[in-house]
Amino acid sequence: MNTLQKTAGAILSLSLLCGMQVYAFPDYPSLRGQIIEQSDICQGVVKDANGESIIGASVLVKGTTNGSITGLDGDFSLRNVKKGDIIVVSYVGYQSQEIAWTGGPLNIVLKEDAEVLDEVVVIGYGAVRKADMAGSVAVLDNKNFKDQPITQVADALQGRVSGVHVENSGVPGGSVKIRIRGANSISKSNDPLYVVDGIVRESGLDGINPEDIRSMQVLKDASSTAIYGSRGSNGVVLITTKIGKAGVREIMFDASVGVSNVYKRYDILGAYDYALALKEVKGIDFSNEEMQSYQNGTAGIDWQDEIFRTGITQNYKLALSNGSEKTQYYISANYMSQEGVVIESKNERYQAKANLSSQLTDWLHITADINASHGVRRGGSFASGKDNPIWIALNYSPTMTMMAENGNYNTDTYNSIASNPVGILKLQSGETMTNVFNGRVDLRLDIMKGLTFTTTNGVDYYDGKSYSFSSKRVGTKSGMGNNDTYRLMLQSSNNLTYTGSWNDHHLTATAVYEVTSSETRTMGITGNNLLTEGVGWWNVGMASSRDANNGYEQWALMSGVTRVMYNYKDRYMLTGTFRADGSSRFAKKKWGYFPSIAAAWTLSNEDFMKDVSSVQDIKLRASYGIVGSQAISPYATMGLMSATAYNFGTNSNFTGYWANDIATPELTWEKTKQFDLGLEFSLFDRRLNFSVDYFYKRTTDALLKRSIPGYVGGNSFWVNDGEISNRGIDLSVTARIMQNDRFQWTSTLNGTYLKNRVERLSGGENDFINGSSPAAGMVDYATIIKPGEAIGTFWGYEWTGLDEKGHDTYTDVDGNQMIDGGDRKVIGKANPDFTLGWNNSLSYKNWDLNLFFNGSFGAKRLNLVRYTMASAEGNSRFVTLADAYLKGFDKIGSSATYPSLTEGGNNLQPVSTKWLENADFLRLENISLSYTFPKKTTGFADLRLTFSCQNLFTITGYKGMDPAGTTFSNSSVDVDAGIDMGAYPSPRTFTFGLRMNF
């Protein structure tokens, strides 16, 4: 191990001291700066063979829980030690030492241990040395985001792992879209599989405290994901949570407060200019008194000021861990409150976790883990549609007053948008409460040397209750709704693993039998025209009309898994995996089979590379495998009936039943075949590390829903139809630019190039599937599924500028001398070609600085907010965008982008290149500065102060509030992605944090 590696190890340990829970026993002023012999105090220093201090080494009195870790100078101090006690000193990468204390100071030198230098990586149903891996697995340690005010786990993945793309709705506690190497499915979920400590979570990442995470592994290629078979096609995120440590008591308290605001707004017309425009274009007069009040600011409304606010985020975390050589525990609790930057939007989380691990006998080990959370999210819907309050606010007249004399919220008389945006947010909001409980028990039996049996049994419980209320003070009628979703998933995994070595051969063989069952129950009730609004959504008994519904789903999965990993001389690695899944979701073809194979060659361990000192750790990897998706409802292959009303005779209405879905018993799995070719190597004595992967995925038997004409019975059915491909390159570069005792600088760059393409639909190259309308009655469908194009492709008109009258013009694609549906064409796509993340960590003495950049290039956004703000026709009926009036054709002539408002007959198309904007951006996602006061300074604990800023600046040409913002209708699919119709803006947040390690 060279000096650089040792220094890096020291810095790693320093970050653990500063960023993780650490307990150190009370400091004594009389002992500072020197080592004094004392009858019950054992002191000493731990160094490596070169005399460099080792920071963070574990020092323990053998057979007790009396322990500590070394400080910044490699020093330690233990109380209540008797002469003759055995002191055990250990540190990752070094051989442990046991020394009998004779009463004097200890000067301990640890020797390198080559056998443990390799990082251990958690993979499906096991763990493996990183050097032995043949597949593509990305590892994200909690140190990568330790000083960043992350409120949800998905934020930690954004930009930090190549091949992973994250889009956040921005709503506190709202939806997050995560894609691993692109979208594989057209109409079903593209979300990855989440596995926490070996248990699959249908509840996703809800209820997980980021502080509890030890590491995350992202399985990307088929060699890694095939072990999850029918649920691995979209990639797998493995999360390993924290546990207690033997001999080290750790108490941690962390508190942070953040202030958020909207840092970019639209330039809209003030009340005075709006009134002038109305008079000029519509001939609407205002009195002199009104115009005077608009001009001096005593009247009028700035709707952005009304709906946006300063949001406050509070986050408090407490953790305690301890343990002996045989039993360890970890307990944590978290309270988080996040006020959104839109009024009435808020998210709260109450969470607790406990973990107990014990070696009961020499051959039996048990681990028990529970995680419980209660979440409350308040606020309305910010999805695409004419009810989005942000979109409404940006189109509402600034000349109106907020409230009517009768106490109702006023509506805008100059457009046809029915509801007041402030009224919607205050009186038509809702509340969603979620209770998530996850628990597991592991039993590991060490049958004989190298042979272990582990049974992991877990539960994933979710109960979500949503309440909604609408007031007649805002709309035309009052209403309420209550909905409850209950889901319980049980999983039992039984794992037999053999690990053995002989001569230069190393073999690990795993066999797994697993059963999973899940049931979901739903119940809902709505009421309209309430007699009184006094009790909000607890009001169904006073509704003049009521409707109720309920539902039930159940499914089960039975699986068998085998995996063999072979290593010869640490040069040649071969991994083979096979999984068989039997799913109750399919009527006939219940069983699917998912094999994979991977090979790796570590060239740097070959004899002919011994004299090559310029390059280290060269490894070539290749893998191929098949994974699948069973992402359909449990009864999708069956013919389902539903009630419907019909007339019979002249004055009689009857209720009957008809086929809601047509049976498709031959429906089977989506299958994704993936090839991966990777190269890893290091330069300059491992100061510069590279990893690059080329991948190609092709999904066949895509699950699509097709419709049949009404004259032959109507309705829809599921089919296996279509093929989708994803190809690209993942790149990761880590540079340890500076590593010495005082200053360290590490820089990591992750990048992914991705090309998504629909290869085939059953109708041939001219077949296509329309997307959905983002706002029915105002905008037609904006996207299309078409062979040769990406999922999420925009289908619209090519804008060619303004004519001599100031009218918008478009390309006449079909040449019929008019602009109609035949002139639509592919005009862009929602998903980026290239994404990157760039992280820089700098440390100087007790100071730490972190800068994290996130970028996306090649994506388009359909800015329907700007379209309606610039339109004097349709639902908005009049402009609110300042440039649309002040820089229109009638004001500045031929250089204008916006048409003349005084010239009628304009053809303003919403889905066109005029409103389809370049969404490229480079953003300083986070900058944080921390200072650590060591315990010898404070006298009671290590104290770390952190100041950070999220979204400090964004470089972009996008004209909306946020180039990364989209209004999700469904975050699991990608067909209608990239539409901004009032996307919740990502705020700029300043956070101050305090962390104490006792």
Where are the predicted features?
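Extracytoplasmic gating/loop element in the C-terminal half of outer-membrane beta-barrel translocons
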Residues: 293, 304, 542, 583, ...
